[in-house]
A protein has these predicted regions:
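Conserved GNAT-fold acetyl-CoA-binding loop/helix
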Residues: 26-54
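A short helix-loop-beta-strand connector motif used in the catalytic cores of GNAT acetyltransferases and
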Residues: 53-65, 86
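A short, internal acetyl-CoA/4′-phosphopantetheine-binding micro-motif in the GNAT/acyltransferase core
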Residues: 65, 90-97, 125-127
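Conserved acetyl-CoA-binding loop-helix of GNAT-fold acetyltransferases
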Residues: 92, 98-111, 134-138
């Protein structure tokens, strides 16, 4: 798969592999620093995850990575829970954010989920993560639940149908 925007570098999307763990962890940490600044602390799973934990997570994962040249510039993980595709840790390199890679990687993961039998996709983000919420809404996701925090609104869960 290649990106279609002419203003962005051509990205090649492929399934995520266990061998990608080191580079994906580096990308994830770089991408989630902005989230840590929004929420006032770095004690969040994308920033504290270990290499060993990520390697274990990538076994039989439906996620994808996007590469420009030899560099992984975007990644997302996903797994099936029945017919529900659970998508997580969407990360785009800070210098590539806003170039369409978030949509590209999200579409690729959704397609892998469809091929594996998913009928619906779910993801979540923090309530203060406005750019994430804009992306997910633009891509057809709708809020289904708020959870966590004193007022139950720290995390926003969103879903999208994957079938016509």
């Amino acid at each position: 798969m290649a990106s279609s925007r002419s203003s962005e570098p051509q990205a090649r999307v492929r399934p995520i592999e266990t061998a990608d763990a080191g580079e994906v962890l580096t990308l994830q940490r770089a991408a989630f620093v902005s989230e840590a600044l929004i929420y006032g602390g770095a004690d969040m799973p994308p920033l504290t995850q270990t290499l060993e934990g990520l390697e274990a997570e990538l076994v039989e994962n439906l996620g994808c990575v996007a590469e420009v040249g030899e560099r992984i510039v975007a990644a997302a993980r996903a797994r099936l829970d029945g017919e529900l595709l659970l998508i997580g840790r969407i990360a785009v390199a800070p210098d590539m954010q806003g170039s369409g890679l978030g949509s590209l990687i999200l579409h690729a993961v959704e397609e892998r989920g469809r091929e594996a039998g998913a009928r619906e996709a779910e993801l979540f983000t923090g309530r203060l993560s406005e750019a994430n919420l804009r992306l997910y809404t633009r891509e057809g996701y709708r809020e289904t639940e708020r959870a966590g925090g004193e007022k139950g609104e720290d995390q926003i869960f969103l879903r999208k149908s994957l079938v016509p």
